[in-house]
């Protein structure tokens, strides 16, 4: 590898399905940067060795995906965001020190800012699900100043665990209490896999949501979930999962290649075409 060419990679197992190379190669071309982005299929038993010798493998940083996100936290110097979410998805060097962060938070908030400017005028949000993605969403909303987050999960204990982690602005509610929480929610976010291709649908009557509410779905296959379609039918603004995927990639690129890229309509169209059934 030429000394002038900087390269990053995606470490996962499996990882071949990822659109990250498409996204980063687009930005490299747009910005005229001599660089590369590869996929490294690394099994769990080889992950620690690979990460601890990332420079030796020719990389200035990496994205991390399933099943390595929690292990990456332990092998690096994590920031506040990675610790809060309990997982790292982006690795980068600070001198010889390998640091980690979680860019899902910036991806979620950046997508909302781009798709529904002014979404944060509402002080109340309703978040569905209490998994890893929910932690990133809750952290981002609290950081942005949302005063009350109703958190619905089928297992109320998992929602209570997030309240214990993030404080009393997070209010756990039973899944059956979602209808009662809708009238006061200026933002509704689905962080579950419900509505994803091959998964059960997410069935919620949105008629009680305020007329100026925003609906966000982290699912991006299909691009327009039933939840988003129902929101659009009511005239509500929406933010889809593909937008979050694109925006979460921005900071990693900046850390590795020293230039902050932009999420453009052209990039979105490129990834949409790649996601389309062949």
Curated annotation (Swiss-Prot):
For this UniProt record, the keywords arranged alphabetically read as follows: Amino-acid biosynthesis, Aromatic amino acid biosynthesis, NADP, Oxidoreductase
Q: What is its EC number?
A: 1.1.1.25
* A GO biological process held by the record: aromatic amino acid family biosynthetic process
**Reactions this protein catalyses:** shikimate + NADP(+) = 3-dehydroshikimate + NADPH + H(+)
Q: Does the keyword Oxidoreductase apply?
A: yes
The record's CDD domains line, in alphabetical order, gives: NAD_bind_Shikimate_DH
Q: Where is the signal peptide?
A: none
Q: In which pathway does it act?
A: Metabolic intermediate biosynthesis; chorismate biosynthesis; chorismate from D-erythrose 4-phosphate and phosphoenolpyruvate: step 4/7
Q: Which residues bind shikimate?
A: 18-20, 65, 89, 104, 220
**What is annotated as the active site?**
69 (proton acceptor)
Q: Which GO terms describe its cellular component?
A: cytosol
Keyword Mitochondrion part of the UniProt annotation: no
Give the record's family classification.
Belongs to the shikimate dehydrogenase family.
- HAMAP family given for it? Shikimate_DH_AroE
What role does this protein play?
Answer: Involved in the biosynthesis of the chorismate, which leads to the biosynthesis of aromatic amino acids. Catalyzes the reversible NADPH linked reduction of 3-dehydroshikimate (DHSA) to yield shikimate (SA).
Protein name as catalogued:
Shikimate dehydrogenase (NADP(+))
Q: Which organism is it from?
A: Rhodopseudomonas palustris (strain ATCC BAA-98 / CGA009)
Q: Which gene encodes it?
A: aroE
């Amino acid at each position: 590898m030429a000394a002038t060419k900087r390269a990053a990679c995606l470490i996962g197992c499996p990882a071949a399905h990822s659109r990250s190379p498409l996204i980063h190669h687009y930005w490299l071309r747009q910005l005229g940067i001599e660089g590369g982005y590869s996929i490294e299929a690394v099994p769990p038993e080889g992950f620690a060795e690979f990460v601890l010798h990332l420079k030796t493998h020719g990389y200035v940083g990496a994205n991390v995906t399933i099943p390595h996100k929690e292990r990456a936290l332990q092998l690096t110097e994590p920031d506040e965001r990675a610790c809060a979410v309990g997982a790292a998805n982006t690795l980068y060097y600070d001198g010889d020190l390998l640091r980690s962060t979680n860019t899902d938070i910036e991806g979620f908030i950046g997508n909302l800012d781009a798709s529904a400017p002014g979404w944060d005028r509402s002080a109340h949000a309703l978040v569905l699900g209490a998994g890893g993605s929910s932690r990133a969403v809750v952290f981002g909303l609290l950081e942005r100043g949302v005063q009350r987050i109703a958190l619905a999960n089928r297992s109320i204990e998992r929602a209570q665990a997030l309240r214990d982690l993030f404080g009393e602005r997070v209010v756990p509610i039973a899944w059956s209490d979602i209808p009662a929480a809708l009238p006061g929610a200026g933002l509704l976010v689905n962080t579950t896999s419900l509505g994803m291709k091959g998964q059960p649908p997410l069935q919620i009557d949105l008629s009680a949501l305020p007329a100026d509410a925003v609906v966000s779905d982290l699912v991006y296959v299909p691009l327009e979930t039933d939840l988003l379609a129902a929101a659009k039918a009511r005239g509500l603004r929406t933010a889809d999962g593909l937008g979050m995927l694109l925006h979460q990639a921005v900071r990693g690129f900046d850390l590795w290649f020293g230039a902050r890229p932009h999420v453009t309509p052209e990039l979105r169209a490129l990834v949409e075409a790649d996601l389309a059934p062949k």
